[in-house]
Amino acid sequence: MKMLLLLCLGLTLVCVHAEEASSTGRNFNVEKINGEWHTIILASDKREKIEDNGNFRLFLEQIHVLENSLVLKFHTVRDEECSELSMVADKTEKAGEYSVTYDGFNTFTIPKTDYDNFLMAHLINEKDGETFQLMGLYGREPDLSSDIKERFAQLCEKHGILRENIIDLSNANRCLQARE
């Protein structure tokens, strides 16, 4: 009986783990990230980039998947006014990597997603010979569980981003009223 319970537990853990994907992995299905998203947390090794009025304090509204690119629709807040910003990210030659020009040259991957609830993105920006990295946690709903937020914080730490540079935006003005 104990063996049967252990087998069931093991199979359950395998099934739960199998539902997560990475854009650099073989099991990644880009079509499944299509649709509405909300910015939950931003993190960066240059915190000023994601603070109020920072150029990378962007609130994701939608990802539209095309054949070799992604159309990303964001909102940004400047002087308490919401503005819409759209950009096209093109596939690069590296598996699961996309590039976009915005305040420099950016490449990004999606290290983790379960498609239905959350998406974690890792971006590297290069501008004027300097680089910084940014990570974002996005949800299908306006907020996510503390467990997912903690997993994101641990992923940030693995990329060298300190916890004090992680900003939870779930209670910030994310221009939710500007969504169509």
UniProtKB/Swiss-Prot annotation:
GO process terms (BP): aerobic respiration; cellular response to food; cellular response to lipid; cellular response to starvation; cellular response to testosterone stimulus; energy reserve metabolic process; glucose homeostasis; heat generation
Disulfide-linked positions: 82-175
Keywords: Disulfide bond, Pheromone-binding, Secreted, Signal, Transport
Signal peptide extent: 1-18
Pfam family, one: Lipocalin
InterPro entries: Calycin, Lipocalin, Lipocalin_CS, Lipocln_cytosolic_FA-bd_dom, Maj_urinary
PROSITE patterns in the record: LIPOCALIN (PS00213)
Compartment annotation: Secreted
Classification via CDD domains: lipocalin_MUP-like
GO molecular function, one term: insulin receptor activity
Tissues where the protein occurs: Abundant in the urine of adult male mice but absent from that of females.
GO CC entries: cytosol; extracellular space; nucleus
Major localization listed first in the record, in broad terms: secreted
Function description: Binds pheromones that are released from drying urine of males. These pheromones affect the sexual behavior of females.
Family from the record: Belongs to the calycin superfamily. Lipocalin family.
Protein name as catalogued: Major urinary protein 1
Organism: Mus musculus
Gene giving rise to this polypeptide: Mup1
